[in-house]
């Protein structure tokens, strides 16, 4: 894997592992608690993150077939990324784009979700490992609102997206009604 992608991916993996360890020691009641019917539980936050990552990877896997036709990222995609990441840093709740929506399940198990996310990140690693510097600069990823990004920009967006939800995890755990066991 080229160095810039390797560094960004390592940063993503550390972030994910830290987030998982925030929730690992909690009971299933705590992990699946929702403050209200319209909110996500801790594990549903993880499912949302995985859904967004899965859909992004699936899209890019298809787009790579025509990579020679794609433009490279530049100042415009850098500016769009800066704007998107600025929005993610605001303490505002956004409706998830359709591509990141998921069908809630009756039951969630932390170990199953962790294993699914581990597998998904292995697939990401294998995908990223195939790119040289030139092809990694192509605008492969498409955010539903902010448009196309190259691979480094995509990994930076994913980091900010996860970070946005790290704050949500903290709010859930700090909620006065959060189950204590």
Give the residues covered by each predicted segment.
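Extreme N-terminal tail/first-helix region
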Residues: 1-17
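Hydrophobic packing residues in well-ordered alpha-helices of helical domains and bundles
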Residues: 5, 12, 42, 113-117, ...
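Hydrophobic alpha-helical core bundles mediating ligand binding, dimerization, or RNAP-core interactions
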Residues: 16-19, 53, 117, 121-124
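Acidic/histidine-rich alpha-helical segments that form the ligand environment
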Residues: 81-135
């Amino acid at each position: 894997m080229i160095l810039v992608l390797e560094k960004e991916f390592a940063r993503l993996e550390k972030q994910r592992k830290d987030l998982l360890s925030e929730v690992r020691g909690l009971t299933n009641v705590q992990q699946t608690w929702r403050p209200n019917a319209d909110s996500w539980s801790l594990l549903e936050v993880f499912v949302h993150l995985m859904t967004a990552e899965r859909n992004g990877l699936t899209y890019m896997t298809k787009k790579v077939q025509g990579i020679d036709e794609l433009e490279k990222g530049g100042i415009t995609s850098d500016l769009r990324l800066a704007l998107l990441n600025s929005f993610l840093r605001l303490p505002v709740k956004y409706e998830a784009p359709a591509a990141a929506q998921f069908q809630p399940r009756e039951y969630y198990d932390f170990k199953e979700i962790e294993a699914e996310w581990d597998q998904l990140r292995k697939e990401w690693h294998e995908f990223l490992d195939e790119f040289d510097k030139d092809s990694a600069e192509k605008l492969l990823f498409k955010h539903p609102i902010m448009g196309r990004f190259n691979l480094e920009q995509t990994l930076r967006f994913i980091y900010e997206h996860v970070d946005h939800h790290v704050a949500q995890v903290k709010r859930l755990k700090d909620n006065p009604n959060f189950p204590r066991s």
